[in-house]
């Protein structure tokens, strides 16, 4: 496997050739003073040698297997690192979340992987399917990565996705709930420089991958939506040039030259509620082609279920991620209102 990766420099190909597991982990050094460790299928770590590094960056993709643009973006970066085209100055862990689902061309095989973090994999039915086992392993790999160095570290986790439906804001990020911790203006402007100028502040703990890293390691973590889902090879990768350039600068320790925080350059939303499915007959009143961030006025009936109506409570609420087909008990939609900068630092 080492020789295969050394020759091809294509970690995605190695991962897809062994979607369930690798028979062994391995490590090696590149000629440009970079140490590489492969921990599992879809799990590869790069660490610069001989330099003082202060940042730990996790880049995850394919938590949903059919969200291909982030997979291609991460594979480009991994190939550049393996080909010694980049001079790495900070530690990076790449995670290809759900390789079997990539093969299958679906979001998941048995269960939505991004509902299984922060210990959810072992609750209820326990480790009863491959996604639950994978969620536990991914948590362990993040812990291993973030725990490897002590002292003052800047930890980041960007979990990259694409959305099922079209959006009024093509690229947007979900900033996980942080309790009493402030939200980072610097991180928001980093994302703005990546072409992601719309931020959703979550209102409660969740079981997503980004919340896991934020809550347990105080990482600056985000779920980042980079556009709409397309099949592998059909993504217009020019739409991700800014993201790739900023991630490259970050990994290579270059000056980021971020603009000052400016509300005029941003769209900030506060999640005001998450609507969970209670009955099998749940249905939205709007059509399937309604875009993310479509706004509805107070009193508008968003959905019906079990003889009840779900109505808009604020003057206006925008919706994201509507999905009536989830199992009972899971989220069907997030409702948003405008946010200000009162909780930003």
UniProtKB/Swiss-Prot annotation:
The cofactor binding remark recorded in the entry reads: Binds 1 zinc ion per subunit.
SUPFAM superfamilies on file: Zn-dependent exopeptidases
Query: What EC identifiers does the entry list?
Result: 3.5.1.96
Query: Which Pfam families does the record associate with it?
Result: AstE_AspA_cat, AstE_AspA_hybrid
Record InterPro entries: AspA/AstE_fam, AstE_AspA_cat, Aste_AspA_hybrid_dom, SuccinylGlu_desuccinylase
Q: Which GO terms describe its biological process?
A: arginine catabolic process to glutamate; arginine catabolic process to succinate
Q: Which residues form the active site?
A: 225
Name one molecular function that GO assigns to this entry: succinylglutamate desuccinylase activity
Which keywords does UniProt give here? Arginine metabolism, Hydrolase, Metal-binding, Zinc
Which amino acid positions bind Zn(2+), per UniProt? 64, 67, 161
Pathway connected to this protein? Amino-acid degradation; L-arginine degradation via AST pathway; L-glutamate and succinate from L-arginine: step 5/5
Family, as annotated: Belongs to the AspA/AstE family. Succinylglutamate desuccinylase subfamily.
Q: Which NCBIfam families match?
A: arg_catab_astE, PRK05324.1
Task: Tell me the function of this protein.
Answer: Transforms N(2)-succinylglutamate into succinate and glutamate.
Q: Mind telling me what this protein is named?
A: Succinylglutamate desuccinylase
